[in-house]
């Protein structure tokens, strides 16, 4: 097998699914069917790659294996651009997506400088409840770029009046601005910002609302109330499939966590998730460990508010 080629093969080769397993107490029949298929195919090792929902699947399958006395080993392998898995330092996929977002934001900022009058560009970034990807927009700040003007994470309640006041304040200085918003920002009553406009809701198999439209809603509001030329940009699928921006560290660590999962399963472990443990910042180094899936499944690691500051042009994010 050509490992180097495998490392650079799009994950779409493996396929994906969005299927939520029921609780064992509510539907044993579904689990019986799954285990029958695994037994018929003589599958003894089951590796599931993904984020929170995937780890929930590993938890349920490994629990059922214990209940029924099955010797199949179930291991979770972390992979999510959301970076919201508990325990692990970070997740493979996040670094590449963050790299794409930082570079894209810098290019959008440059584009806005072409105008000699104030404009607003609102960029909507993935992140339902955790704002790690949106916070990555702060990485656009560098010696040759002042960075984005405002960043809004789902960890904080979104105040529309305060938002409009900040936009008006920046526009009064006569310059264009770029704003990064998480798709999952909510107002005080718990509604997503995109729900403030007429919207047909779509809910996936895990009960998650399809999030999109917050940037467009805010852009329309700014245009209507402040009369400023405003555009909304949804990075959408691009932030998770931009292979030209893949992080080398991501490739290495994805390979490492996969290999660690196989090794652990062969050594008899089950109901575990491989995690990355940082042992050094300079030079950067992470090692792999395994952790009980019950301490990870359905637990979201959110951005600590201590990381935030009033202005993303400061060292911290807004």
Task: Describe the role of every protein-language-model region.
Residues 1-43, 53, 106:
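Glycine-rich oxoanion-binding loops at beta->alpha junctions
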């Amino acid at each position: 097998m050509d490992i180097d080629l495998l490392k650079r093969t799009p994950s779409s080769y493996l396929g994906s699914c969005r299927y939520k397993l029921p609780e064992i107490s509510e539907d044993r029949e579904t689990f019986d069917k799954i285990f029958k298929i695994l037994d018929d195919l003589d599958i003894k090792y089951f590796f599931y790659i993904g984020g929170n929902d995937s780890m929930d699947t590993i938890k349920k399958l490994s629990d059922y294996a214990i209940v029924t006395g099955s010797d199949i080993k179930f291991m979770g392998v972390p992979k999510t651009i959301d970076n919201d898995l508990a325990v692990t330092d970070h997740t493979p996929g996040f670094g590449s997506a963050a790299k794409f977002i930082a570079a894209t934001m810098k290019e959008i900022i440059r584009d806005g400088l072409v105008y000699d009058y104030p404009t607003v560009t609102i960029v909507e970034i993935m992140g339902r409840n955790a704002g790690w990807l949106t916070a990555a927009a702060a990485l656009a700040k560098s010696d040759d770029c002042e960075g984005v003007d405002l960043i809004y994470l789902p960890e904080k309640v979104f105040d529309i009046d305060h938002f409009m006041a900040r936009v008006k304040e920046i526009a009064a200085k006569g310059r264009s601005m770029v704003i990064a918003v998480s798709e999952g920002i909510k107002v005080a009553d718990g509604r997503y910002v995109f729900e403030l406009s007429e919207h047909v809701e779509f809910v996936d198999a895990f009960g998650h609302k399809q999030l999109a439209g917050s940037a467009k809603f805010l852009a329309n509001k700014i245009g209507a109330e402040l009369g400023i030329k405003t555009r909304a940009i949804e990075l959408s699928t691009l932030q998770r499939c931009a292979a030209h921006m893949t992080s080398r560290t991501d490739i290495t660590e994805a390979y490492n966590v996969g290999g660690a999962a196989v090794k652990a399963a062969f050594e008899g472990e089950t109901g575990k998730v491989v995690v990355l443990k940082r042992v050094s910042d300079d030079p950067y180094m992470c090692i792999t460990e395994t952790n009980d899936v019950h301490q990870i499944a359905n637990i979201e690691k959110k951005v600590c508010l201590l990381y935030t500051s009033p202005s993303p042009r400061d060292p911290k994010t807004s």
